[in-house]
Amino acid sequence: MNKLTSSYSPVHVIGGGLAGSEAAWQIAEAGVPVILHEMRGVRGTDAHKTDSLAELVCSNSFRSDDATSNAVGVLHAEMRLAGSIIMRCADLNQVPAGGALAVDREGFAEAVSAAIAAHPLITVLREEIRGLPPKEWDLAIIATGPLTAPDLADAIRAETGADALAFFDAIAPIVHADTIDMDICWHQSRYDKVGPGGTGKDYINCPLTQEEYNAFIDALIAGDKTGFKEWEGTPYFDGCLPIEVMAERGRETLRHGPMKPMGLTNAHNPSVKPYAVVQLRQDNALGTLYNMVGFQTKLKYGAQGEVFRMIPGLEKAEFARLGGLHRNTYINSPTLLDQSLTLKSRAGLRFAGQITGCEGYVESASIGLLAGRFAAAERKGASPAIPPVTTAFGALLNHITGGHIVSDDEPGKRSFQPMNVNFGLFPPLDPGALTRPEGAKRFRGKEKASAKKQAMASRALSDCATWLDKNLLIGGAATR
């Protein structure tokens, strides 16, 4: 396909993951040419299996798609409003997952790759960038993610004058569906919740008795684990703790976490409530693969087979992919980046995605979306328009560029940590924003918390729509 030429100089985007792909798309949609540099195809990583753009290396879930009362769902909706290629391809490749938006990981990555390749203003170069962008690349975005190659990571550290922070991330196993014993397991979403493309029976559930649960916990804790080596002392991100680390924190931790039995009824024995339940979520459109929800692990491969086949219904399970462990790195964004994600020490150089310290697929993609819009605006001679902090975009951006800063003279100075989007990042509602249920003098039980979330979600989507309307990135002049 012939690429278009443009009166604008290109913006360079380094990294073709979720954030880099989204950034490139937003820039190109604004009429500015993009050169997207991706090293996979020349050099691999410890976690990626393909050369596809936007490959999902951990879960296949984009989490809740509820835009009425869930912060992640609100972020989904805002990204759709902004023309996100990541959300478009996710919607086109969704698989049933209760109230969540989950995707066929291969179909999703292939769709993103095809869209990027077909865009007339995007050129993809398969090459490793070993240092910071040269000065002649006056506008560039680094979106190399948590697995940034060592040479580039060293260059970033040299430029910022501080070591990148690091944390471990762990990957959950994937099981062949036809090796799961459905005489023991059953299909059901928690509380029978129906989500996008779902039926209320979107998960496979494996029940455990108290005796089976305790035996599983003992084996999990005793299982042979991957050594830390030079990564000793690196903290985990709480949202992706290895399951054995959770078990070590207390025998009941898993039963109140990923193995909680609430909202589930054993179809084979409805009168007996399981002591614990392991859930598996559909991983591909064909329904032939299921991933073990919340079962990210650093157990060695041999131990994984032994321990996970103790779970009722998985005694003969065959694994399409075993779990694993890799190190994620991110910069100290609040001290290094301004509100437009530009490195304070170097004009025109932005960071986006997980390397900025956001956590989660859509969070990473959304920061790529913003970085792309900011870079496109700058290329066109305009000032980047910062989204209101009342939006999911703005709340997450504010956390990254301004969160967790405590003055040097305060004792117990806190460090910046990765964060998923959540309503705790949003500013409080204005007084009187909540209205009590009709005819009621006050909220009952959890009504107030629910009403607060709904009001924050409504405010976010309204403010986001207004922000986008005021800051349209109209495609620029381009010719063949």
Swiss-Prot record:
Its job: Catalyzes the folate-dependent formation of 5-methyl-uridine at position 54 (M-5-U54) in all tRNAs.
Cofactor names: FAD
Catalytic activity of the protein: uridine(54) in tRNA + (6R)-5,10-methylene-5,6,7,8-tetrahydrofolate + NADH + H(+) = 5-methyluridine(54) in tRNA + (6S)-5,6,7,8-tetrahydrofolate + NAD(+); uridine(54) in tRNA + (6R)-5,10-methylene-5,6,7,8-tetrahydrofolate + NADPH + H(+) = 5-methyluridine(54) in tRNA + (6S)-5,6,7,8-tetrahydrofolate + NADP(+)
Enzyme Commission number(s) of this protein: 2.1.1.74
GO biological process terms on file: tRNA methylation; tRNA wobble uridine modification
Keywords, ordered alphabetically: Cytoplasm, FAD, Flavoprotein, Methyltransferase, NAD, NADP, Transferase, tRNA processing
Binding site for FAD: 15-20
Family: Belongs to the MnmG family. TrmFO subfamily.
Pfam families to which the protein is assigned, alphabetical: GIDA (PF01134)
Any one Gene Ontology cellular component term annotated for this protein: cytosol
Gene3D superfamilies reported in the protein's UniProt record: FAD/NAD(P)-binding domain (3.50.50.60)
GO molecular function terms noted in the UniProt entry: flavin adenine dinucleotide binding; tRNA (uracil(54)-C5)-methyltransferase activity, 5,10-methylenetetrahydrofolate-dependent
Protein name per UniProt: Methylenetetrahydrofolate--tRNA-(uracil-5-)-methyltransferase TrmFO
Originating species: Sinorhizobium medicae (strain WSM419)
Compartments where found: Cytoplasm
Domain of life: Bacteria
